[in-house]
């Protein structure tokens, strides 16, 4: 399944993996998964975190290594994000709930994820998704961006 991913996708997933793998040991633990989920405004229980790990933990060692992570991401991409997941993700970014993601909101979430972006990088991300050119991302633009990945 992971062999259907492009090199670019694999390198993006490697970057995402290292955001989760806080101590850089090559595996994601329930603790690390919890940290990232909480930084995204989610509040999973220990049991939910364990379930998430168990779903992709092919060798049953209780952690996720990069090949397992790739399999999970490939599976997720195949099940293309449901409308509900996209709505939830939009809410995470749209901090003030006004229906738009501003550059400041985007920067805030990315910083919480451990991604230190320059103003130019944030502006570039907004520009790429901002179809109507108003300088922010509305829900329709967000959906298009999520489905075009």
From Swiss-Prot:
Ca(2+) 1 binds at residues 21, 23, 25, 27, 32. Ca(2+) 4 binds at residues 130, 132, 134, 136, 141. Ca(2+) 3 binds at residues 94, 96, 98, 100, 105. Signal peptide: none annotated. Ca(2+) 2 binds at residues 57, 59, 61, 63, 68. It comes from the Eukaryota. The modification N-acetylalanine is found at residue 2. Pfam families: EF-hand_7. GO terms for molecular function: calcium ion binding. InterPro entries: CALM/Myosin/TropC-like, EF-hand-dom_pair, EF_Hand_1_Ca_BS, EF_hand_dom. Trimethylation of Lys-116 observed in other calmodulins is absent here. PANTHER family: CALMODULIN LIKE 3, MYOSIN LIGHT CHAIN 1, 3. This protein has four functional calcium-binding sites. Belongs to the calmodulin family. This is Calmodulin. It comes from Pleurotus cornucopiae (Cornucopia mushroom).
